[in-house]
Amino acid sequence: MAKKITGYIKLQVPAGKANPAPPIGPALGQHGVNIMEFCKAFNAKTQADEGTITPVVITVYADRSFTFITKTPPVPVLIKKAAGIASGSAVPNKTKVGKLTKAQVEEIAKTKMPDLNAASLEAAMRTVEGTARSMGVDIV
């Protein structure tokens, strides 16, 4: 028989840098999960992408064991990395902070495809372009 699930925890953690400090410690502590065990497993799984923000969904079971699934980094993080900017524009319609080529947008869309609910690559590209526009990044 399958284990009884007691909760799901969604977090965004820098890859390879999970530690018991907030926000991870309190979120896992509420569910009685072994925090260090999660940190070691997460850091081992994500050490290749160290420093990149990585969403993770942790499934907690009744016996206090857990499993976790890492997802692809959020689109704004990928856009900032590709455009080489620190943050988006405070007024995106007036102040543009960077530029992305169609090829870069396509690359980001391919990376995010497993986590997006887009039917095609073109739809995923439009999603990425919309996010870029709202950050003040031009698509050329």
From Swiss-Prot:
What lineage does the source organism belong to? Bacteria, Pseudomonadati, Thermodesulfobacteriota, Desulfuromonadia, Desulfuromonadales
InterPro entries registered for this protein in UniProt:
Ribosomal_uL11, Ribosomal_uL11_bac-typ, Ribosomal_uL11_C, Ribosomal_uL11_C_sf, Ribosomal_uL11_N, Ribosomal_uL11_N_sf
Function, as annotated, reads: Forms part of the ribosomal stalk which helps the ribosome interact with GTP-bound translation factors.
Gene Ontology BP, a term: translation
* Subunit-level organization: Part of the ribosomal stalk of the 50S ribosomal subunit. Interacts with L10 and the large rRNA to form the base of the stalk. L10 forms an elongated spine to which L12 dimers bind in a sequential fashion forming a multimeric L10(L12)X complex.
Q: Which GO terms describe its molecular function?
A: large ribosomal subunit rRNA binding; structural constituent of ribosome
Q: Which residues form a coiled coil?
A: none
Q: CDD domains attached here?
A: Ribosomal_L11 (cd00349)
Asked if the record carries the keyword Ribonucleoprotein, the reply is yes
Annotated protein name in UniProt: Large ribosomal subunit protein uL11
NCBIfam families registered for this protein in UniProt: L11_bact
Q: Which UniProt keywords apply?
A: Methylation, Ribonucleoprotein, Ribosomal protein, RNA-binding, rRNA-binding
Q: How is it modified after translation?
A: One or more lysine residues are methylated.
